[in-house]
């Protein structure tokens, strides 16, 4: 029996000389604004994707011009924490070296730039490096940006959890010097074929992307169960003692292919803080060795666990870690939203959470968000914390500085907007015009769509109820739509699949309710359901739970078996 053929990316990684490929040669070429097909896969490991302006694609084709290529670069910012000085550097880059002139906060607690011409890539990466920031492993078949609850109320516990998140990020970084050589002009050392170049990853890295999050109960804004690997903090007397480990979550799927599906992670048990790195490395190396390298659509950890079985996977992880799981500890996970406005921490410092619509920090008529953040950064003595809901926390503000910070935020439109419960719990991906995978709008359309949802809630007398609404332009699920009470997933321009039935806490997936429908149909369906919900809901019952209890959709118990159909 012949050996099964590997996915093309596996050969690219093997032949890349530890992610070098011909990126340097492509960067130096002025013949085209793009990289070669192979290098387009490798540059992801360095933190950026090649894109083009899809709004202009046909026009440029008629003019016999190549697409207007640009790049999206994503930074690695573990836990979403950066200093005001770093932010000023980030802002300067956005203002001078990108065509979008904006900073986009992401659903994974970092920021990204859009509209970067190839000639500016190296300058941007070197600019980030001067601020002790980088983009290595922000994309690609590696451990991505590690998330951690900002949780400003429990500041001591947050600090402990954040340190774990940062150590995880640093420990699981690729060891290759390709990034330093290509972008930072460091000297190339003698290339070796020895696997010790990448002691954890090996020559072919992971089969697919790997996402990790640290949650600090009662908050679940990091959507811990949607990650490949999750650590839910367990505290005793305010001190971190360990984590409940979860594994096997992931949102991506492909329309019409039932062998692909979103999945929430399984609970595996409690581990002590000192064993976190052992277990993280064990889970990753099992995925490295067992993951599917022939079909990238089935390469995520969730499929590895489904295909090999929970008990077999658990036993292998314990064997590699050299430690057994203890029974999971009781913790309560609740709200996935952010605490907007001022919140006082246990240390007496104050934290101001700003709502950033779809995470886009940009100066527009009536709202100078980018200027406002710049002015705050010039005087702020604490830090900035990006949230996984695409918002920003001005953290660690002394009582005597509150009025000044708030004044600047209000002056520039960062504070003071009327914010409904649902809008504050809702997110969207970028989608068109830059994302090559988008089938429909998301970020550009989402504010208008939420206006409609707000109006329907007001009409039906349920404005007091927060509903988690999420929209993506495709089923890859960057804004985690399959864990939303109302999920909209792009199918074609102006058309979406409507998903219902996830719970508010993020521990149950939703299920398709209507397929390939337009705005008018979506709003008509939701209007009718909101009317029922207003009358028939039980006390304290959330919308997602209502749709399951009343049989609007069936609960998803085991996604491999019941997400489809």
UniProtKB/Swiss-Prot annotation:
Keywords: 4Fe-4S, Amino-acid biosynthesis, Cysteine biosynthesis, Heme, Iron, Iron-sulfur, Metal-binding, NADP, Oxidoreductase
Residues reported to bind siroheme: 478
Enzyme class: oxidoreductase
Gene3D superfamilies: Sulfite Reductase Hemoprotein, domain 1
The keyword Heme appears for this protein: yes
Function according to Swiss-Prot or TrEMBL: Component of the sulfite reductase complex that catalyzes the 6-electron reduction of sulfite to sulfide. This is one of several activities required for the biosynthesis of L-cysteine from sulfate.
Name of the molecule in the record: Sulfite reductase [NADPH] hemoprotein beta-component
